[in-house]
């Protein structure tokens, strides 16, 4: 690595005269030379820890093809020295004067358009040097190919303080051909010419390209896999650069040196503790004595744990046989112990491949994140050392401290906060639990903060739960990206669900994928899973009213039963809750997207302790809610949602479960018209679909009904939907904003208001949290001008995670009178007035303007 790393002193003759950073605590200014050396140190550290050489070798083989040794060494030198050149532009005399308080060659100041900017100047320094080197190559095709990468790498440097813009926008600024008249690149080059002549005594600046069509079209004939490789490498280098720069700056400013980036240490010990847990011991004992059980004996088996154990061991065997593949599918019935199976598979990868030292567990909802954190706690909770390596990354949980309070005793607090923040920004945790949304920001977000943790994905295991919850309009793009990322970055991806589409039908990338449960029928058709719940369609003959539904439910609740009712629209759930609350003699609860994790836990605890209870809910109930009901009622939507819902009924399989389906609201309004799965012909209105729900033949459902339609839509002429156009136009040309827009998992709450309802909430441990105190703490923190930025950032994130339990999203048309507003959050002092006796939000208060005038 060091062999190709250039020394800044040999490239520029003023690196010790110019400064890169000024410290706030009276430390000496940091020279450009010192900062570059530190940045190189971190770049090399990341390179080694993450085995980036393997990524580059794979990229060269797959993307560059056969090139001369000379060109290959130059290509690698160009990549490695992105970090070397990233701050060269700080020699800018205006930067030195304005930002560093240092008078330096003011006669060579750039024009006012550039002002004190440095990133664009760094990028032309980089281009100037490497275009000169490329010129020396003999082969013209190699010269042109390497020039492409010189421009891409210089683009990365130009963006290391900002978000990722469209590559073409940057290129056009270099040639002055930008439609917006953006010509910073042209101005930067003119300044560099002058600078080289006056300061470095050099005359020439190599000629820049002034047309980009050939470069951008160069791979138009290529397969999508190569386009994903180009995107992944660009994002990886950008992520490594901003990480190295941040780590180096933190070391200078705060003295915090980062030695490891959250790799799992003492892997064997963790696996040992896992294998000693009661569940694992019983699985291993079964494996020695009975596994594999013959088909007949298994069909007669009445203990659901035996089936879970068989499935666990089947998946483990398949994985070991195919350990070199990259993408694995784990299709297993609801309630078959997928989470534990996935944990075991992650550890199996680590045992077999010592490069893999990081695990990401990724779920569709925060409730699932929380639930799986609880499972990990059950296994490792006694072991503090293991639990310091596990972190939940979302907005609901405070930032993790990976160090002992005692370690910081008497030490500089600011160093502690710096480390906590860096760990969170760069995902420096060995085991990360988070959501699909977080992962997609890391993979596709155009903001610098999004890409911070991208390099951490190299040599990791990513377990993706419930992938079918993504918009199916994105399935083809998702599997194409995932397969490319997995191959290039050595990621092992496990995709798991009870209703798993065969995504292979949607991609041209034919790299081997592995189905971990080869004999799915053995489990899906087993009475313990298939006959646990019976579906009843008597209410589906026509549209139903809420009154008719209520009457039917009251006919069922009599003899001590727990009943779950799911609506697909929140408004219907709320209306029905109010209606049935007035009539019902047993307890009634409501669970919607409004219910905080705390609220949900309380409701679940109450339900467990009662014999007769009614739970009214929205889709939040479909996954990750640990309840076991006797009877279910569900408004029909997508077949995979119906199956998920059935998983909430008769989970223990100890009695007969029943689910009634009804038709109330229009699913298109909820899931969007681009979801193939809500078309009437593939819903439970059709006899054929009812049969699939009974036989659990989801592969057939997807392969015959859904995937062909998704594929057809992806081939439509409409460029917004066309898969090929997206990869050829946006991915190949590195149109980062377009890629982010396309790969958005959900349309965010654009027109919603955040309202903070201050009240008292009782935590699980019985502690009472006062929302008014938390708001006051938040206000004081914002007003504190003296606190250091890093400490303030950490504390603000932590207080915001506490505030989430009090914040509700309301429509922009909501009527209310706030007591205070900070930023985009409206504060209401007497929040209690907005909840009923069950702690359920009374949304109608915000609709009719009665609000606080009570």
Regions found by a protein language model. Name each.
Residues 499-556:
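Interdomain hinge/linker at the junction between the two RecA-like core domains of SF2 helicases
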Residues 392-403, 568-571, 588-602, 618-622:
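Conserved helicase motor
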Residues 2-285:
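Accessory nucleic-acid engagement/destabilization modules that flank
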Residues 357-380, 394-397:
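Conserved Walker A/P-loop ATP-binding site and its immediately adjacent core
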Residues 486, 551-560, 566, 571, ...:
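C-terminal helicase lobe and adjacent C-terminal extensions/tails of nucleic-acid helicase motors
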Residues 383-444:
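Inter-Walker segment of RecA-like/P-loop motor cores
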Residues 437, 450-484:
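SF2 helicase catalytic motif II
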Residues 323-346:
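Walker A/P-loop
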